[in-house]
Amino acid sequence: PMHAFDSRKVEKIRIKRFGTPFTFQTLDGVERNIDENTLMICNDNTPVAIAGIMGGLDSEIVDDTHTLTLESATFNAVSIRKSTVRLAHRTDASMRYEKCLDPEMTVPAIARFVKLMTDVDKDVKVVSSLTDEYAFHYDTVELDFDKAFVDKYTGIEIDNDTIIST
C-alpha cells in the first residue's frame, strides 16, 4: 500500500513513536486515541498518518491539491496488528500490512503509480528524488535448481533465459 499526501502539508516524512498518548483525527473524521506504542508517519514532528492503517484528515488530498508527497513503505506486521487491535480500526491497508509485505516492492510501487498518473495526464512531473530508507534486508538464499524437474512438472520445456528472468 501507498499513501499520498498534499505536499503543501507534508514536505518531509519521518516515522516515529511519540512518548506520550494524544488524539489524532483520521481521514474518516474520527478522533483516535494514539498511545506511545503506535507508529506514526509525521511531517517532521507533526503526525500525518497512523503507519500502515490510515492517513490523517489534516494532510488529505483536496480539490485544489496539485502536488503530492508519496509514501510507499512496509512496516512490521506484528506492530501494525497490535495498533489495529488497540485502535479497534481495521482497514484495507492494515490487512495488507499484517501479511508481511515484501519490502522490495516499495520502489516499484511508486514507479507504477507515476506511470499510471502519466498515462492519465501527460503533464504529470516528478519534481523530487526518491528517498529509500531500507531498515530491513532479507538474507540472500541460494537454492539448488533442477531444470529437468521444472520441464517435467510443467509439461513443457522452458528455456533458461525465461526461467532466470522470472
Regions found by a protein language model. Give the residues of each.
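RNA/tRNA-interacting regions in translation and RNA-turnover enzymes
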Residues: 1-166
